[in-house]
């Protein structure tokens, strides 16, 4: 059985929840998740595989955040190359912003 837990103990980069267009999205760390991350627009949940290193976890969060934004905008067919590139740029921006 896969258990899910709300993200509480990871770096503050990753929120436990956030809002897009009036909907609350919940971020959960999921042990043994087959993929690194998953974005579910039906339940407004982002699942991230628990146990990855911080760099992989943060990059996965930003990748899944891009999916959440695209779903919120009504886009259902996501180009993974575009999502990965945009997610990596957001992650880089966030890390650079923290150092300023």
Question: Where are the regions that the model predicts?
Answer:
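Short Lys/Arg-rich cationic patches that frequently serve as NLS/NoLS or arginine-rich RNA/DNA-binding motifs
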Residues: 1-8
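Short pre-active-site segment immediately N-terminal to the catalytic Zn-binding motif
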Residues: 41-61, 75
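Catalytic zinc-binding patch centered on the HExxH motif and its immediate surroundings
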Residues: 10-47
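Post-HExxH zinc-binding segment in Zn-dependent metallohydrolases
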Residues: 73-100
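Low-complexity, intrinsically disordered short peptide segments enriched in small/polar/basic residues
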Residues: 24-27, 63, 80
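Active-site recognition of the HExxH zinc-binding catalytic motif
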Residues: 59-71
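Short, flexible active-site-adjacent loop segments at beta-strand->alpha-helix junctions, enriched
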Residues: 24, 52, 89
